[in-house]
Amino acid sequence: ASVLLLLPEWSWLAALLSALPAAAFAVLTLKLLRQSRRGADVSTAFWRLGMACLLLSSLAASAVALGVPGLELLAGVLFLYGFAGSLTCGMLYKIVPFLVWLHLQRLSQRRFAIPNMKQIISEGWIRYQWRGHLASVPLLALALSWPSRWLLLPAAVSLMLSQLLLARNLCYAVRRYRSAVAAMAAAPVSA
C-alpha cells in the first residue's frame, strides 16, 4: 500500500487498503469482547467505544480517500479522541489500580490490610467519567465537523468534565496509595 502512495492516481486505493486492517481489527476486537466470559466492567465499555470509533474513523478515512469532502476532521476526532482516548482511559482504569495494589502488596509483606483493586478507584466514579466521555465523543465529532457555537460549547464542557473526572479518579488512586503507606509507617513494629 505504501508504494501506491507514490502514484497519485492510485493514492485512493492505498488509503482504502490502509483503512481495511484497522476496520478488521475493530470488528474482531468487538467480537472478542462480546464473547468474553468475564463480566463486563466500565473499562470494557471504554474499549467497546474505542473500537466503534476506530471502525467509524476507518470508514470516514476511506470516504475521504474516495473524494468525499469535509470528513477529514471527523476521521481525526474519531481516531484520536474516540479510539485512542477511549482505550487510554480504559487501560488507565485497569493499570493504575493494579500498580497501586502491587506496590502496597510489596510494602505490606502481608502484615497490613490493603485495599483491593476495586477500592482504589470507585466503580461509581469511573462510571461518571465514562458518561462524560461517552457524551463528549459525538459532541466533539459534531462540533468539529459542523462548526457552530451551539455545538462547540456543549462539546467543550463535556470534554472538560470528562478529563477533570479522569484527573480526579487518578489523583484519588494516588491519595489511597499515600494514605495506605502512611498507615503502614505509623503502625507499631512487632518483634
Region annotations inferred by a language model:
Residues 1-191:
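Hydrophobic alpha-helical transmembrane segments of multi-pass integral membrane proteins
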